[in-house]
């Protein structure tokens, strides 16, 4: 048997997958390791739904869906949702939670590049939240997301800027001081400057529509979307019409 890896198998970081597999059983614990994701999800969902003109009746792909927090919430909005992830345990948790909640989401274990090879231009909306900084080749993910969306469709990315403030806030602050996420969750070398992400987007048929920052105030313990992309940020793009 040929032992060579497939052309897209390189874009999997098994150490990153192992991090999330280890805590997958607590994905839906509102006070556990994924508490920040639960808290920012209404902001993410609201941004995606508003800028997509609503999600009802739309075919949506959630890339790097993990345990299904965003995927389920989009399905509750009336979307037909597919969730992609390479972690077996997070997907098992996602499937069980969807079953218990009476929510229909199709969860698939494969890379976004593999999915794009089989489902090009099939989705109205593609989301890729907090995933780009966990893969070896984020540009490949951007390209695959662009290939999956229909003409005129929406693609959303979120990630973390790469600078001193982002390291201080997302690594030192979130992991070691406030202990909002487990130590070792983030690697500052994998953070992505907005100019880099926009450069990759410009090489596809996607066009930037809007960019916003996701901000946390430790004094009020509140998250909000607002201008300023020096730490966490979200990008909305659209695919050109034929």
Curated annotation (Swiss-Prot):
Residues the entry annotates as binding S-adenosyl-L-methionine: 44, 64, 85, 129
GO molecular function terms listed in the Swiss-Prot or TrEMBL record: 2-polyprenyl-6-hydroxyphenol methylase activity; 3-demethylubiquinol 3-O-methyltransferase activity; polyprenyldihydroxybenzoate methyltransferase activity
One record GO biological process: methylation
Family recorded in the similarity comment: Belongs to the methyltransferase superfamily. UbiG/COQ3 family.
Gene that this polypeptide is encoded by: ubiG
Record keywords: Methyltransferase, S-adenosyl-L-methionine, Transferase, Ubiquinone biosynthesis
NCBIfam families reported in the protein's UniProt record: UbiG
Tagged with keyword Nucleotide-binding: no
Role of this protein: O-methyltransferase that catalyzes the 2 O-methylation steps in the ubiquinone biosynthetic pathway.
Identification of the protein by name: Ubiquinone biosynthesis O-methyltransferase
EC code(s) of this entry: 2.1.1.222, 2.1.1.64
Pathway: Cofactor biosynthesis; ubiquinone biosynthesis
Domain of life: Bacteria
């Amino acid at each position: 048997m040929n032992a060579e890896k497939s052309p897209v198998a390189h874009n999997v970081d098994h150490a990153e997958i192992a991090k999330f597999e280890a805590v997958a059983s607590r994905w839906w614990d509102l006070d556990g390791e994924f508490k920040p994701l639960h808290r920012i999800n209404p902001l993410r969902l609201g941004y995606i739904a508003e800028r997509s003109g609503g999600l009802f009746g739309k075919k949506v792909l959630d890339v790097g869906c993990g345990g299904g927090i965003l995927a389920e919430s989009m399905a509750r909005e009336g979307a037909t949702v597919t969730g992609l992830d390479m972690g077996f345990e997070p997907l098992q948790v996602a499937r069980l939670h969807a079953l218990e909640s009476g929510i229909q989401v199709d969860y698939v274990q494969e890379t976004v590049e593999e999915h794009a090879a089989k489902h090009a231009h099939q989705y109205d909306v593609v989301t890729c939240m907090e995933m780009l900084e966990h893969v070896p080749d984020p540009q490949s993910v951007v390209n695959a997301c662009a290939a999956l969306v229909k003409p005129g469709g929406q693609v959303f990315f979120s990630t973390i800027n790469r600078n001193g403030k982002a390291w201080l806030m997302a690594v030192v602050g979130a992991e070691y001081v406030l202990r909002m996420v487990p130590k070792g969750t983030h690697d500052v070398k994998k953070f992505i400057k907005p100019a880099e992400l926009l450069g990759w987007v410009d090489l596809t048929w996607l066009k930037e529509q809007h960019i916003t920052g996701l901000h946390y105030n430790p004094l009020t313990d509140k998250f909000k979307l607002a201008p300023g992309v020096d730490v966490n940020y979200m990008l909305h793009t659209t695919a050109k019409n034929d």
